[in-house]
Every structure is written in C-alpha cells, then in structure tokens.
Amino acid sequence: MVPATGQLALLALGILLAVCQALENSTSPLSDSPVAAAVVSHFNKCPDSHTQYCFHGTCRFLVQEEKPACVCHSGYVGVRCEHADLLAVVAASQKKQAITALVVVSIVALAVLIITCVLIHCCQLRKHCEWCRALVCRHEKPSALLKGRTACCHSETVV
C-alpha cells in the first residue's frame, strides 16, 4: 500500500521539525561570552530636606534626573500623591460590600439549612417532639376528630 501525498507531507514535516530542534539544542560553546550588566539603582533615598515631599506615599530620589519622585500609597495619585484616586476608593468600597453581602447570604443559607434539617428530623420522630406535633395537629382536618378517631396529638381525643 502506498501512503497518500498528505501523509508523506506530514512525515516530511515531522522529520524537518525533529532535525531543527536537534540543531537548536546543540551543546556547542558560545562564541561570545555573556557580559554581566552593571547593577546600578535608579533611585536613592530622599535627602532630609525632602522627607515631607510626598503627601501619601514614599519619597525616592531619581539619580539621573536629580529630583525627588513619589511612590504613592494605594488610593492616591499625582506627582506628590496629593490626589485621592476615587476609582480605587470606590472599587475598594464595592469589594467590601460584596464580601459583606456574601457573608450575610452564607449565614442566612446556613441557618435555613440547619432549621430544615431540624424540622425533617423532628417530623421523622414526631412522637418525641411536642412542638412538631402541635404544628402537625394544627393542620389536621377536624373530620378525623369528629369520626371518633384518635388524633395525632395524644392530648386531643374526641368523646
């Protein structure tokens, strides 16, 4: 059986990719050795004369420009961190509201689940639970009482 043209093309492509990858991963030494870059900080501490330069941030002194700059705290913007970022404040407030709502909904759902489990357990063991019997007996049809049958509650019998 002779392979189809498409299969031959895929086979050739696979061989070509394998050869290229083998050449790419060669272990021959590099011709030029890497040169370590000098580590120089672009920032220094601000001088004492600029300790109060930033209103809501940390002062840094730019080495190349020889002037102070500010790294603003979250929620503040501006050259000297003098403006409140209203979008950040609103986003933080919305996040707190969402977390509060989630906690409240979780507590309510847990309370409903616990009450449901207690009611199911109580109704399965009706004879041991007075308040469950009172709930069931309140909804019992009066016709059952009038025919001389015993009611679900032991305290209610018709003479």
From Swiss-Prot:
UniProt keyword list: Cell membrane, Disulfide bond, EGF-like domain, Glycoprotein, Growth factor, Lipoprotein, Membrane, Mitogen, Palmitate, Secreted, Signal, Transmembrane, Transmembrane helix
Residues on Cytoplasmic side: 124-159
Signal peptide, first to last residue: 1-23
Disulphide bridges: 46-59, 54-70, 72-81
UniProt cross-references to SUPFAM superfamilies, sorted A to Z: EGF/Laminin
Propeptide, chain numbering: 24-38, 89-159
Domain EGF-like: residue ranges: 44-83
InterPro entries noted in UniProt: EGF-like_dom
GO biological process, one term: cell surface receptor signaling pathway
Residue intervals on the Extracellular side: 24-97
Residues glycosylated per entry: 25
CC per GO annotation: basolateral plasma membrane; cell surface; cytoplasmic vesicle; extracellular space; perinuclear region of cytoplasm
Record PANTHER family: PROTRANSFORMING GROWTH FACTOR ALPHA (PTHR10740:SF1), TRANSFORMING GROWTH FACTOR ALPHA (PTHR10740)
UniProt name for this protein: Protransforming growth factor alpha
Phylogenetic placement of the source organism: Eukaryota, Metazoa, Chordata, Craniata, Vertebrata
Gene designation per UniProt: Tgfa
